[in-house]
Amino acid sequence: MLAEMLWPAVNMLLPRKALLVDIFFILAATNLMIAAFALGCLAFYKQLVYITIGNLTFPHQSGDEVIRAMYIPPVNDSVDFNPGFRLSWLNTLSPLSDGPYDSWSQCEICPGRFVGQKACYYVPPKTYSFQNCFFACKNISKCFYLYTPQNITDPFFDHTLRDQDIWIGTFFKKLNAALSTIDNNFDYTAWDELSVYCAYLTRRSRSTVYFTDCTTSKLCLCGQEDFTPAPFYEALTPAPVHG
């Protein structure tokens, strides 16, 4: 008798309980969708503002921004960026105003193979690591140093970069530092930043590019500026390459 009296009330509660369960699952599913959407947006944002090279991640910056310091997480001793140890040789390099390069009278005549608009260039036939290019250029002539070109539209680069990339004398001496060159003279507004200490020119792009492995062998751009070219060396200027 009691069961018969309570059964209508139970029947009235069952739909309400089912409705509450449905609402709970709907809310839970909605929250999951919102969370998934937020994570997707975050991943897309990181894809836009970060670039990953191997297991190193670097903030991506537009080319015309001023170079900012970047943190590189340690990987292992063989590839870790440790300017205090591995780049100590860069800290010993002196600018031209403090060095022996511009004190040699014979530097007034270009001893190199090619003469550009203002610079005298020489490219050793062998390839070297970025570090060894500094010494290769110095060993060829007291006039030469690993050079950073001011005019990469010079026909010389059409001739030289046809086959290979070439190291140039642009580098970081340490983290949290500005770019440096031996002659303290460069005027670039666009760079590819990979937060490494070496830079090169490539046949694929007229922009200067940073390279992740500075021990790789490439050609070296040895050069000097502010000289008086002799007629013999002027005749060696390469003709523009078309096509």
UniProtKB/Swiss-Prot annotation:
Cysteine-cysteine disulfides: 137-222, 198-214
Keywords: Disulfide bond, Host membrane, Membrane, Transmembrane, Transmembrane helix
Chain coiled-coil ranges: none
Keyword field contains Transmembrane: yes
Primary residence: host cell
Organism domain of life: Viruses
Ranges annotated as spanning the membrane: 23-43
Entry membrane topology: Single-pass membrane protein
Segments forming domain C-type lectin: 116-223
GO cellular component, one term: host cell membrane
Keyword Ligase attributed: no
Localization of this protein: Host membrane
InterPro entries on file: C-type_lectin-like, C-type_lectin-like/link_sf, CTDL_fold
UniProt-recorded name of the protein: Putative C-type lectin protein A7
Organism phylogeny: Viruses, Duplodnaviria, Heunggongvirae, Peploviricota, Herviviricetes
